[in-house]
Amino acid sequence: TSECVGEIIMKIACIIPSRYASTRLPGKPLRMIAGQTLIHRVYNRAILAKSPDIVVVATDYRAIAEEVEGFGGRVVMTAVNHPTGTDRLAEVAEQLADYDIIVNVQGDEPFIDPDVIDRLAKMLTEHENLDMVTAAAPLKKEEYQDASAVKVVVNQKGEALYFSRALIPYPREGFAMPPLKHIGVYAYRRSFL
């Protein structure tokens, strides 16, 4: 549902970029996980969030679009030449001119917490000085050297300083915060994209 800020109602869209031609695992969105495709599971988690007025899958692959339509989801076909998921997101955001906030949920996050979507959208509705926000969580010990876990270092205000798949050294004692694990969810003001 839309967020009301003062007298202004902000409309929120959740977009799930999904492409078939993954480098590490081609066809990943259509892979079955306990009887449902990956993209279906991600969509089902996203629609549990309370803040989005609309949830849309953005894809350049017809079979993914057909899968989404088959389970009753919304889908927008995009160009095939986008270098990143954010570029695909921006293409769809241009078509959603009535929406103020765009939440980007990665198409390979079947366990995304819907509350994270809501919290990121709320950050932008409550802080007009922010154009983009993302999420992070404590890094588990076994993830420190895992290249698939994106680490993020933040300053004392919680602002990201840098991201890395490599091990990030930090002092065990002192003021430095240990690295966090980046969660692949972003929220943007549509005008920022």
Each model region followed by its residue ranges:
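Short, high-confidence coil segments that cap the C-terminus of an alpha-helix
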Residues: 52, 98-99, 127-130
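Short beta-strand segments
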Residues: 17, 104-106, 135-136
